[in-house]
């Protein structure tokens, strides 16, 4: 039977503190390294900890040890008996996964609303979903916070510099706390396309109407003139 490493508890406590800190600071679109297995790259589901404080999914490390009798990271000798269950870590993992799930739901709703706004019938006013809450203008490069708030990247960056990393409500926020919202960017491109086309349509329509009226009048005059010429020619060619 393997002797329990006296530092196991200390390793666990340290790992839990650092994992919780990383999870709290991580954007939901990222994956905290301390909550994932270094072997399979997936979230820790059945975590075990080694005497040196490295954490793995039990199934992955056991499979590794079938062919290699060493720790994947330290390269020091390691056996299955050296592994200690680490269920306490699952509280942090599950909490982050839940945060990720809620964030994705919120983000999907934003994208759905943006799709509708991008294809509206009238383009007289910019939809609120495409307006930056700071600059009050159309967003060029959208970025999103962990809470689902959207800004224009340049406007937010300048604002945070001026306020010492505080958002418009006074809460702490840095440019590192946001990620580019590409799905919204694509809908803004669609909106700009339709808005530009609508503007061009409104500008061209009067000219086309005037041009068509002029063309119709000329065509009618020419047709009538040609008809009269044909009548006269026919009359002159007739013999009595």
Curated annotation (Swiss-Prot):
> SMART domains this protein is in?
Ubox
> Which EC number applies?
2.3.2.27
The highest taxon in the source lineage is Bacteria
The UniProt entry's GO CC annotations, sorted and at most eight, read: cytoplasm; extracellular region; host cell
Keywords from the UniProt entry? Repeat, Secreted, Transferase, Ubl conjugation, Ubl conjugation pathway, Virulence
* Modifications the protein undergoes after translation, according to the UniProt entry: Ubiquitinated in the presence of host E1 ubiquitin-activating enzyme, E2 ubiquitin-conjugating enzyme and ubiquitin.
Q: Which GO terms describe its molecular function?
A: protein-folding chaperone binding; ubiquitin protein ligase activity; ubiquitin-protein transferase activity
Q: Which GO terms describe its biological process?
A: cellular response to misfolded protein; positive regulation of proteolysis; proteasome-mediated ubiquitin-dependent protein catabolic process; protein polyubiquitination; protein quality control for misfolded or incompletely synthesized proteins; protein ubiquitination
What is the protein's name according to its record? E3 ubiquitin-protein ligase LubX
* Gene that specifies this protein: lubX
